[in-house]
Amino acid sequence: MTQEIYISDWLEKDYKDVYNQLHKVLSEFGITPKTLPYSEEVWCRDYMPIHIGEGKYVGFNFQPDYLWDDPKYHKYITRQELAIEDLNINISDNVDIVLDGGNYVRCGDKVVMTDKIFSENPNWRPLALLCRLEEAFQAEIILLPWDMNEPFGHSDGMIAWLGDDRILLNNYHQLEKGKRKSFSTRIRKILNSQFDIVELKYGGTLSRDSWCYMNYIETDNAIILPALSMNHDGENDKAALKMFQNVFDNKVIRQVFAQPLIKHGGALHCATWNHYIL
C-alpha cells in the first residue's frame, strides 16, 4: 500500500514559510505532497474521510461546533464530497454523524476518541452512536474525557499509536496541578487498561504550546516534528527532539518551524491528510 500526503492549498496561501519547509523536508524522503484544491481552510485532517485500512474510507458530517455555531464561520466549512471529487477514494461507509478527523486515532483493532462525540450528536442515543461508529470503523471505540482546556476535543492531540499495544501519551503528567491532576489520572486509568503507555516529557521551562509535539507527521522512515523556535534551538524543541529520537529509534527525526500554525491551534498532523493506494 502506497502512502500519499495531501495538504490544503491554503497552507501555501496563508503559511508560506511552513509550506516551503515542509516541502523541503518531505522531499528528503522522496515525498511530494499533493494539493487539495476544493478546501475552505488549512486543517484538512479534520474534514477529509477517515482511512480504516485496506484502502477503505469512512465519510462523515463535518459540522464542528467551533465553526457551525457561528454563521460567520460557515464559509470555512469544507464540503467533504467536493474535497474528494478528483480523488479515487473507496468510501466504504458514510455515517450520518458529526465528527472531526482529528478525533480519531486508530490503534490496531481499536479507535480512540474523546467523549465530545456525544455533545456533537445530541440526536443520537449514546449506545446507538457508539455501535454505529464501531460498525463503520470496524473497531472497538475507546473513549477519553474531553479536555475542556482544548475546545476542539481531538484525541490526536492526546495520544498516538506506536504499534502493537503501545501508545504515546502527551505530557499531561507535567501539568498535574489541581483539576488537571484528576484529568490526567482519568486518562491514564482508561488507557492503562488497554495499552502500554509511553509518556512524553520535556525538560526545562515548559512552553504553553508544548502540546504541539504530539501533532507530528509519520512516514515509513521519518517523523516530521513541529518546532516552536525558528532554528529548532529552543529548550523545549531540543528536549522534544531527544525524546522522539528515543521513542522512534528506527526513524529519522526532522523538525519544521510551525509556530504560525501552532498559534491557531494546530500543527503538522492537523494540516496534512494521508491517502493510501493499494
List each model region and its residues.
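The feature marks the mature, well-folded catalytic cores of soluble enzymes
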Residues: M1-L278
